From Swiss-Prot:
Mitochondrial outer membrane protein involved in the regulation of mitochondrial organization. It is required for mitochondrial fission and promotes the recruitment and association of the fission mediator dynamin-related protein 1 (DNM1L) to the mitochondrial surface independently of the mitochondrial fission FIS1 and MFF proteins. Regulates DNM1L GTPase activity. It comes from the Eukaryota. Expressed in all tissues tested with highest expression in heart and skeletal muscle. It comes from Homo sapiens (Human). Does not bind ADP or other nucleotides, in contrast to MIEF1. The modification Phosphoserine is found at S13. Residues 44-454 are cytoplasmic. SMART domains: Mab-21 (SM01265). This is Mitochondrial dynamics protein MID49. Pfam families: Mab-21_C (PF20266), MID51-like_C (PF21297). One of its GO terms (biological process) is regulation of mitochondrion organization.
Length: 454
């Protein structure tokens, strides 16, 4: 009953509004004429329809139908052609083509009429061309900056070595040698650290290496440096015995000593003034990092305390801030053997493996979702691909890039990336499941549209 009353009231209001419209239109014809009255009538009906939509309840289906109708009207509305620029108005207008209904006549050619110039087609670059442009703009470092960075790193190494010899005269350190990607042609942008090796000179015959899997840590990445010959050379015979923990040379104790020295004892303002730059030790990182600011570049120097060549395999072990039971162990540094292997493979067939590695490093640094993929992960991927006997010329760089993305996605699906030189080490073991999902999704999206990564 209420609905009926509502419809009846609505009908009465419609009739009243309709009579008012008729009255207005009738009088408008006298004043405005027929054309003006028509315009006024259309405007009045539009207002009436707007009022009806706002006041009357409507069914959901009717609303959706009207919405789709309005959308179709918008799509069907012809777009206005833009007005030609003033310069084009002075150009001669080309004659119109004869219509099909016009009688055919002899074809006349006007040699003075110039053909209309079409706009240039949009530039579509291939993946190969985009990779080369990305390499030129985001990867390549100017030679002047490389030379300046090497000079600063070498000067800092000399100053730091002089300080260590005066501060710890009883500890035999070897020559401080700067190195790393900057020196091996593997620097992708300015994000990589300069590696400053601080080697310990251990007495031959008093130390031996124990694999990490044979220790309580059960970590295949690490090694323990054990003190031997205690019956002939008792504890205290070696200056490094002060860093022993349970009969093993502790990397953690040595790192704590050197971190305190770098943060509190070194006169960095004086050294920086001498070298023409600003040097500050990084207090936020557990690693021994020096932040260098020059007017022409910024540089980070990683001070790496190392134990070189204790065994016949000439392994390089680093004092690294490890957690848990592995805190006193030494991390095996694979960078030297990785860089040497990539160089040997490229020299054999004039390949582009190292260029592919630089591209991958720059892409991952430029994408926040891929930030967890470090140089170590990407180097292993390139090494696995690099051992295959495929085309490694510059023309195949785009194909190898996509192949590297596919290999990364496959490894993430299995949550396993074995080390090329030690398959028992899974380089994805430190990633959480959420991080693996995020990286996998970003790589899958990049595989569908590789240009989006560049």
């Amino acid at each position: 009953m209420a609905e009926f009353s509502q419809k009846r009231g609505k009908r009465r209001s419609d009739e009243g509004l309709g009579s008012m419209v008729d009255f207005l239109l009738a009088n408008a014809r006298l004043v405005l004429g027929v054309g003006g009255a028509a315009v006024l009538g259309i405007a009045t009906l539009a207002v009436k329809r707007f009022i009806d939509r706002a006041t009357s309840p409507r069914d959901e289906d009717d609303t959706k139908a009207d919405s789709w109708k309005e959308l179709s009207l918008l799509k069907a509305t012809p777009h206005l052609q833009p007005r030609p620029p003033p310069a084009a108005l002075s150009q001669p207008v080309l004659p119109l083509a004869p219509s099909s209904s016009a009688p055919e006549g002899p074809a006349e050619t006007d040699p003075e009429v110039t053909p209309q110039l079409s706009s240039p087609a949009p530039l579509c670059l291939t993946l190969q061309e985009r990779l080369l442009a990305f390499e030129r703009d985001r990867v390549t470092i100017p030679a002047a900056q490389v030379a300046l960075a090497k000079q600063l790193a070498g000067d800092i190494a000399l100053e730091l070595q002089a300080y260590f010899r005066s501060k710890f005269p009883e500890l035999p350190f070897g020559a401080f040698v700067p190195g790393g990607p900057l020196y091996d042609g593997l620097q992708a942008g300015a994000a990589d650290h300069v590696r400053l090796l601080v080697p310990l000179v251990l007495e031959p015959g008093l130390w031996s290496l124990v694999p990490g899997v044979d220790t309580v840590a059960r970590d295949p990445r690490c090694w323990a440096v054990r003190r031997t010959q205690l019956e002939f050379c008792p504890r205290g015979s070696s200056p490094w015995d002060r860093f022993l923990v349970g009969g093993y040379l502790s990397s953690r104790v040595l790192l704590e000593l050197l971190r305190k020295a770098l943060a509190a004892s070194v006169n960095w303002p004086a050294i920086g003034s001498l070298l023409g730059c600003l040097i500050r030790p990084s207090m936020a990182s557990e690693e021994l990092l020096l932040e260098v600011q020059h007017e022409r570049l910024e540089l980070t120097v990683a001070v790496l305390v190392a134990v070189p060549g204790v065994d016949a395999d000439d392994r390089l072990l680093l004092a690294w801030p490890l957690e848990g039971l592995a805190g006193n162990l030494w991390l095996q540094d694979l960078y030297p053997v990785e860089a040497a292997r990539l160089r040997a493979l490229d020299d054999h067939d004039a390949g582009t493996r190292r260029r592919l590695l630089l591209l991958l490093c720059a892409v991952c640094r430029g994408c926040s979702a891929l930030g967890q993929l470090g140089r170590g992960h990407l180097t292993q991927v390139v090494l696995r691909l690099g051992e295959d006997n495929v085309d490694w010329t510059e023309e195949a760089l785009g194909e190898r890039f996509l192949q590297a993305l596919e290999l990364l996605i496959g490894s993430l699906e299995q949550a396993s990336l074995p080390c090329h030189f030690n398959p028992s080490v899974n380089l994805f073991s430190s990633l959480r499941e959420e991080e693996i999902d995020d990286i996998g999704y970003a790589l899958y999206s990049g595989l569908q549209e590789p240009e989006g990564l560049l």
